[in-house]
């Protein structure tokens, strides 16, 4: 993978998102890239809520995972969505530009949770639905993770002298402390905010990798706080299996970070808290964990 290959792929991607009048919209670029996000299990479905790009805060879409505890917010880098954009606009060796756009997503989340946008965003604005959701105590109680996903048709590079090579940019997670009410009780919780950059390098890798573009990597020491002792159970030419005991708190933390990337659809359906039985099990775990194993 080199810069010329990425520039060619970018041109093909944007041409595919161009309408009959020669116009490239943010939403058409987003819709054309959703299959790649499903392929890497970053999202569960191509069906998302589209928000016209004229709305505030550059949010062009949002979705929830099947279990209902993860909100995904989609932003598009408007500066990058132009076939004629200059190299200095689409080739980045620093992630400051992307960080600024991702933080605008966090700004929208914070203001919505605090209901500061109720007067600013009209009810007729498609973004108002999400804004009102985030301002609801019921919804805040339900959501544990918010992913801010920035789609940019730019190319991330590492500069070494005059030579530029493709690179992936990563962004640190953070915790957002929120206050809400449940059953007349004032509560606080921390929502995990994750930032994801989907750029040309990422999309190109998906297109050529045949499903292996973004393998899931887990640091057990970071996730579980220590190394994990295992016992080899079976060994064949191309396969090994191990037995181990994993702490429940670590598994919870792992699912919180990776969610649907860990699970096949049948398991995701089992964990769907919109189903009454699953919702009651979740309530038992939260409010009376000592009863859960017996149940």
Language-model-derived ranges and their functions:
Residues 5, 12-285:
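N-terminal extension/subdomain marker
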Residues 1-7:
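Nuclease-adjacent, charged terminal/linker segments that flank catalytic cores
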Residues 290-295:
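A sequence-level detector for short glycine-anchored, His/Arg-bearing signature motifs
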């Amino acid at each position: 993978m080199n810069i010329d290959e990425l520039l060619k792929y970018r041109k093909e991607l944007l041409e595919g998102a161009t309408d009959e009048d020669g116009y490239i919209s943010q939403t058409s670029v987003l819709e054309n890239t959703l299959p790649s996000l499903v392929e890497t299990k970053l999202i569960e479905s191509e069906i998302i809520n589209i928000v016209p790009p004229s709305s505030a805060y550059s949010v062009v879409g949002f979705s929830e995972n099947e279990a209902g505890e993860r909100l995904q917010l989609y932003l598009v880098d408007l500066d990058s969505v132009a076939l004629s954009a200059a190299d200095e606009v689409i080739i980045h060796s620093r992630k400051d530009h992307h960080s600024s756009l991702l933080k605008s997503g966090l700004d929208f989340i914070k203001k919505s949770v605090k209901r500061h946008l109720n007067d600013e965003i009209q009810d007729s604005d498609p973004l108002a639905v999400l804004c009102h959701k985030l301002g609801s105590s019921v919804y805040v109680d339900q959501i544990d993770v918010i992913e801010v996903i920035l789609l940019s048709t730019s190319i991330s590079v590492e500069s070494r002298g005059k030579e530029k090579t493709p690179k992936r940019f990563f962004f640190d997670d953070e915790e957002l402390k929120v206050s809400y009410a449940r059953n007349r009780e004032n509560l606080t919780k921390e929502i995990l905010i994750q930032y994801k950059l989907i750029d040309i390098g990422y999309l190109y890798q998906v297109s050529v990798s045949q499903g292996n573009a973004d393998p899931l990597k887990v640091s057990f020491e970071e996730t579980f706080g220590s190394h994990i002792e295992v016992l080899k159970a079976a060994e064949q030419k191309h396969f090994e299996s191990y037995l181990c005991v994993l702490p429940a708190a670590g598994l919870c933390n792992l699912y919180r970070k990776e969610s649907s990337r860990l699970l096949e659809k049948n398991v995701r359906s089992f964990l769907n808290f919109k189903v009454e039985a699953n919702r009651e099990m979740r309530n038992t775990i939260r409010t009376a964990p000592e009863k859960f194993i017996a149940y």
